[in-house]
Amino acid sequence: MNNIIDGKALANEILADLKLEIQELKDKTNTSPKLAIVLVGNNPASIIYVKHKIKNAHNIGIDTLLVNLSTNIHTDDLILKINELNLNNEISGIIVQLPLPRSIDTNKILSAVLPLKDIDGFHPLNVGYLHSGISQGFIPCTALGCLAVIKKYETNLSGKNVVIIGRSNIVGKPLSALLLKEHCSVTICHSKSQNLSKISSKADIVIAAIGSPVKLTAEYFNPESIVIDVGINRINGNKIIGDVDFENVKSKVKYITPVPGGIGPMTIAFLLNNTVKAFKDSYSTVCH
């Protein structure tokens, strides 16, 4: 049995459905969703990620606007740029490519994006909706991608023991909220957690999101584990690897996502799904 999860294939299914939906929306409204991407500076990894997002968007009929700004821009000036996008009715969704330069107040910037256009789900209002169990607003795309993969391979999540290794606002925290809603028993671990391998090796599902290359070896899992590797670590210049020691772990668990080709494509698919959702929400608001 092939136990390596093909995230690219799953993402392509989502993108194919979105392409059809966008064409229907275009026929109905005579307009298309448009995604604005704010890129500050010239971080090589960020440039690659942005290119992937733009390429996938264009492939399914989403227009894009790339706003490329200098590394030296001040927080207040960046907020002014974001406000321009907030007020532009042609823009359905806005993302600010992270990380931002250290001189910029990231929290202020993420809070400046209009919640209705915050397709990354990072605005405090959208975060509050998610953690309050309110079905409104936007949910971070990586967390949505992880949940979709898990549900594809584990149809009944109720009562499952899940260990999330990593407590970021992008993955760990939002994913914990989604899994609690599915009635999982969720444990969040992090760099200060003790006896980590002892805790994670008892879990049905382990999500690795610590950002430390091949940190998690076979002792962290059991033969029935579903392993979701969210880590994206660049080594030796261009090679990308995950947080899990993939080569030595893959034969010792039930299912595992590779890096690359696992959660990355799913994240982009759900980013574009959120863009379409924002477009539909704005259009229905205008029509009513």
From Swiss-Prot:
Cross-referenced InterPro entries: Aminoacid_DH-like_N_sf, NAD(P)-bd_dom_sf, THF_DH/CycHdrlase, THF_DH/CycHdrlase_cat_dom, THF_DH/CycHdrlase_CS, THF_DH/CycHdrlase_NAD-bd_dom
GO cellular component annotations of the record: cytosol
Record: residues binding NADP(+): G166, R167, S168, S191, I232
A Pfam family assignment: THF_DHG_CYH
Catalytically driven reaction(s): (6R)-5,10-methylene-5,6,7,8-tetrahydrofolate + NADP(+) = (6R)-5,10-methenyltetrahydrofolate + NADPH; (6R)-5,10-methenyltetrahydrofolate + H2O = (6R)-10-formyltetrahydrofolate + H(+)
Annotated keywords: Amino-acid biosynthesis, Histidine biosynthesis, Hydrolase, Methionine biosynthesis, Multifunctional enzyme, NADP, One-carbon metabolism, Oxidoreductase, Purine biosynthesis
GO terms of biological process kind: L-histidine biosynthetic process; methionine biosynthetic process; purine nucleotide biosynthetic process; tetrahydrofolate interconversion
Superkingdom of source: Bacteria
Molecular function terms from GO: methenyltetrahydrofolate cyclohydrolase activity; methylenetetrahydrofolate dehydrogenase (NADP+) activity
Family in the record: Belongs to the tetrahydrofolate dehydrogenase/cyclohydrolase family.
General function of this protein: Catalyzes the oxidation of 5,10-methylenetetrahydrofolate to 5,10-methenyltetrahydrofolate and then the hydrolysis of 5,10-methenyltetrahydrofolate to 10-formyltetrahydrofolate.
Oligomeric form and interacting partners: Homodimer.
Name assigned to this protein: Bifunctional protein FolD
